[in-house]
């Protein structure tokens, strides 16, 4: 995460995305408020989190503290897979703006937060709240048909 924090501070979003793609031999597409289609399946990604007042992190939505602004979650489009850093169960704005727009939602940030399988919401964090690797990471298997779109 330090690489991401340092990179975000020094690069534009487009430069950051190009760098992440190069570092992974084009195997990772970093989504910043955008839709991406792969083999007929649509993904929407947004990295923003609400500010954490005791520390500065990459992808904090610092405008979240103001009364009038455009919430980045308003941009979320209909998709098969929604990928967010923030957990919709702990962020009312995310929960509100993503409601009904996805078939499955994968998120992290609240590392020990729970998943709601009956709502197709899955906490996919691979670290615990203590920043230790999980002994048994959660594996989520979903079935999406290209015909579902």
Label for each model-derived stretch:
Residues 87-149:
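Conserved beta-sheet core of the metallophosphoesterase superfamily
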Residues 1-97:
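Conserved catalytic scaffold of divalent metal-dependent phosphoesterases
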């Amino acid at each position: 995460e330090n690489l991401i924090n340092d990179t975000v501070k020094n690069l534009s979003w487009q430069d950051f995305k190009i760098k992440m793609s190069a570092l992974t031999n084009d195997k990772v597409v970093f989504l910043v408020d955008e839709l991406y289609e792969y083999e007929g399946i649509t993904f929407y990604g947004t990295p923003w989190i609400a500010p954490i007042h005791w520390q500065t992190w990459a992808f904090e939505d610092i405008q979240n503290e103001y009364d009038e602004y455009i919430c980045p979650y308003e941009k979320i489009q209909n998709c098969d897979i929604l990928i967010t850093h923030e957990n919709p169960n702990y962020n009312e704005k995310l929960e509100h703006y993503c409601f009904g727009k996805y078939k499955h939602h994968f998120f992290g940030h609240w590392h020990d937060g729970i998943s709601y399988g009956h709502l197709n919401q899955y906490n996919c964090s691979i670290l615990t709240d203590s920043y230790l690797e999980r002994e048994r990471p959660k594996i989520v298997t979903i079935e999406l048909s290209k015909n579902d779109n």
